[in-house]
Swiss-Prot record:
The keyword Cell division does not apply. Homodimer. It comes from Chlamydia trachomatis serovar L2 (strain ATCC VR-902B / DSM 19102 / 434/Bu). The active site is at residues 52, 124. HAMAP family: RNase_III. Its cofactor is Mg(2+). SMART domains: DSRM (SM00358), RIBOc (SM00535). CDD domains: DSRM_RNAse_III_family (cd10845), RIBOc (cd00593). The keyword Coiled coil does not apply. InterPro entries: dsRBD_dom, RNase_III, RNase_III_dom, RNase_III_sf. Mg(2+) binds at residues 48, 121, 124. This is Ribonuclease 3.
Length: 231
């Protein structure tokens, strides 16, 4: 049984009225839903692709104007913290958009990770739809109020070991660290990542974890503990 979409309720949450509501319906359509209901003409994947770029542009512009003295490296890592899946999941939650997602019955969303991914993709797809329908301005009006204020953004730059390492290497060596991810298996056979962090071609640290993001953090933390006496 196909579900109906309460377009007006979503428009109210977004404070945006679609000239082409079909774009919104497409944004709500998870690929698994289209697999179960072939009458759904298109799923959200292409709009996700577009929305990801829109989000990145708006957040980049926001940070650029908010922090006029911040260097490119810290702007980049701060942006990453504001556009990643966890951040997009939180934006979806703030707007209460998740309840409108059209998703197949067979799609597993029981795990928290699965829900984060689905909701993050939904947010990006909706941004893509808003951009196509109304341009960059309404997309910006949706995104910017969801972002943390300046005082809340500042700690994001230093709490993450990757950000701290980048700041340290830029200040002391005028270079950025680079990361290399390799496949890895834990003792119980679970797949994961072995990440190495290099500075000026030298290995500074390593990390092992189930996710690449966590392994990168561990590698950066080891690099800091070895090379930065303040940590």
């Amino acid at each position: 049984m196909q579900h109906t979409v309460d377009i007006q309720a979503i428009e109210s949450k977004l404070n945006f009225t679609f000239s082409h509501p079909r774009l919104l319906i497409t944004a709500l359509t998870h690929p698994s839903y289209r697999n179960e209901f072939p009458s759904a003409e298109e799923d959200s994947e292409r709009l996700e692709f577009l929305g990801d770029a829109v989000l990145g542009l708006v957040v980049t512009e926001h940070l650029f104007l908010l922090f006029p003295a911040l260097n490119e490296g810290l702007l980049s890592t701060t942006r990453a913290a504001l556009v990643n899946a966890e951040a997009c999941f939180e934006y979806t939650q703030k707007l209460s958009l998740g309840e409108h997602l059209l998703i197949g019955r067979g799609e597993k969303m029981q795990s928290h990770r699965g829900k984060i991914s689905a909701y993050a993709n939904l947010f990006e797809a909706i941004l893509g739809a808003v951009y196509l329908d109304g341009g960059l301005s309404p997309a910006r009006q949706i995104i910017v109020p969801l972002l943390p204020d300046k005082e809340s953004i500042l700690p994001l730059m230093l709490v993450n070991p990757k950000n701290r390492l980048q700041q340290f290497t830029q200040q002391t060596l005028k270079v950025l660290p680079s990361y290399k991810a390799l496949p890895w298996k834990s003792e119980d056979g679970s797949p994961g990542y072995h990440v190495q962090v290099f500075v000026n071609g030298d290995l500074w640290g390593e990390g092992f974890a189930g996710s690449k993001k966590e392994a990168e953090k561990l590698a950066a933390k080891q690099a800091l503990s070895t090379h930065d006496n303040k940590n």
